[in-house]
Each structure stands twice: as C-alpha cells, then as structure tokens.
Amino acid sequence: MSLSTLKNRRERGFFDGQFLIAMPGMEDRNFARTVIYICAHSDAGAMGFVINRPQSLTFTDVLLHLDMIKQEEPIVLPQRARDFPIQTGGPVESGRGFVLHSDDYASDSSIPVSDDICLTATLDIVRAISKGAGPKRATMLLGYSSWGAGQLENEVANNGWLTCPANEELIFDRSLEDKYERALAGMGVTAAMLSAEAGHA
C-alpha cells in the first residue's frame, strides 16, 4: 500500500490504528524488535511506521538538506525544534520524510489517520516546526512500511506479529530504547515469555 492509497481510502480496515509488535523470532532485520503503528489497512494492503528505530540525522540536518537553512549562517532554532525526533519509519521510500502528529496542526495536505493523529508529508509542516509553530506532539519518520494485499494478514496468522490497539503516548514518546519492551508490557507479556512459548510450540 502507498501514500496515495492512504489519501484515497474510503473505510478503515481491521488493523487500522493498531500496533504491530514483532515476535522475538522475527528474522527480517528491517523489522526485528520493532513496534509499528498501522495508519491504513484495506483489501489492497497495509501501511504504517516503525516508531522505535532512531535515525542518526538531526532536525538541523534535515533543514540543511532541504536548503531551509544555510550552513554558513548562524542556526537558531526554538528548543522544541532542536530536540525534534527523527526516526526510521521503514524500508520503503527511506529518503522521504513523513510527520506523524497531533491533530492541533492541519494543512490541506494533512491526512487524518485516527481521531487524534494526522500524517503530513509536505515542507509546510517542517517549516512550521522549525519556527516553533508546529503541532504539540509530533515525530518525523524517514520511510514507511508497506504490505501488499493479504500479506500482513498472512504474517499475523503465521505468528510474525502481535497486535494491539495503538497507544498515542507510546507513539510520541521520545524514549526509544525500551519502547519494544513497554509495548509488550502493555499486553502483559515479555519477550522472554514469548521466546519460551515459541520454543515449546
């Protein structure tokens, strides 16, 4: 599923607004120990963002890359912009930036993905954040994760993923190191418990 499909969707699918939490045995290195927020799911497939993989880039790096600021000029950003988190959202279009954010900011290009969360992938929101005028809660993700028709359903059926309702606090929490463990804890399990179960299956 692509971003254009997300824009044109007419109804929500079963996994919309869910977390996917990788099972401990996940062999795909792109997704091992990941927590993914599913933004769209339909018969055509699914799309979402990994929310616990840090990026080495800073928000200043992004602004320089987009020529919004110049290296030779003094760089003065609001505190919230200096600390703005950049994450790896997935292996598809990994050079493209997407901003998941609270619904207190909206532009013509913002796409609602839940009652409280929107997705914007244009320069307007980057400019707003750089000026301290962006949404109260947001994170930038480079790339996204995508599944074709029936692919995600098969992976879940084959015990590749756990699923649970998404938690907005966890989506925007900037502490990434133990987010996987906290997502599992929210379901009342640990990675060790799941590994032991798999070993006895």
From Swiss-Prot:
InterPro entries: AlgH-like. Pfam families: DUF179. It comes from the Bacteria. SUPFAM superfamilies: VC0467-like. One of its GO terms (cellular component) is cytosol. Belongs to the UPF0301 (AlgH) family. This is UPF0301 protein RHECIAT_CH0001061. It comes from Rhizobium etli (strain CIAT 652).
